[in-house]
Amino acid sequence: MKRILPLLLLCAAAHAAEPARPATTNAPALAAIDSPEWVAKLPAATNATQLFVVAGIGMDKTTAFVSMHEKGADGSWKQILSTPGFVGKNGLCADADHREGCAQTPIGVYRFNKAFGIAPDPGCAIPYVQVDGNAWWSGDPDRQYNQMVDIRDVPDLVLDDSEHIVDYDYQYQYCLNIGFNEDGTPGRGSAIFLHCFGPQKPWTGGCVAVPKDVMLRVMRSVRADCVVVIDTFERLGASW
């Protein structure tokens, strides 16, 4: 019950803060509202025009307040969506402390550097790859670690260390790779994505997860220059 309560509070806050939007099959009709004051004070906000913020409820908690913001021509920030979300099973950790298999979501400032999914391209501004059964995400330290690979090109990939993307048919309908460990340093961690909620698990293996309908709106709204900020709610200076 202690774990569920923060999520229920987040749900209530998200629904209260964000007006209902009509369903659409094209780009989402985003009823933007003023972003909370703390968003404009984030160091990343100085040069960014779009922010995706993951505010974890605590270092050892699996829930987060997730929001997306855009800067207008006048310099003001507007919140275009907000939702409760999940982070790693073991909470958050400093970027430098992250290790493969730690089941923690790294704290830091990143970019989305790849868009992909099992579903067809929803209209993403970042070049999108619709995957098939040949697509794997390498966790093999000796073969293109932390990259998407085609098994036909890397037939000796260590499969037990890697993710077969189509096996995650709930979570990986739509995905954005968070640019953690872009250098591919073996053992630092791989496959840190933003993806859809998985079934029956209020946590992830280290990724960030949001409801599928929200993920679809993110895919249709995100730009290549979007800055991803992950930290605790408290350290971000967040307040209602």
Model-predicted segments: where are they?
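Cell wall/extracellular polymer interaction/catalysis modules
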Residues: 21-204, 213-226, 230-240
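Hydrophobic h-region of N-terminal signal peptides that target proteins for export
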Residues: 7-17
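A conserved hydrophobic position in a structured secondary element of the catalytic/binding core
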Residues: 210
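Sec-dependent signal peptide recognition
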Residues: 1-7
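Short cysteine clusters
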Residues: 207
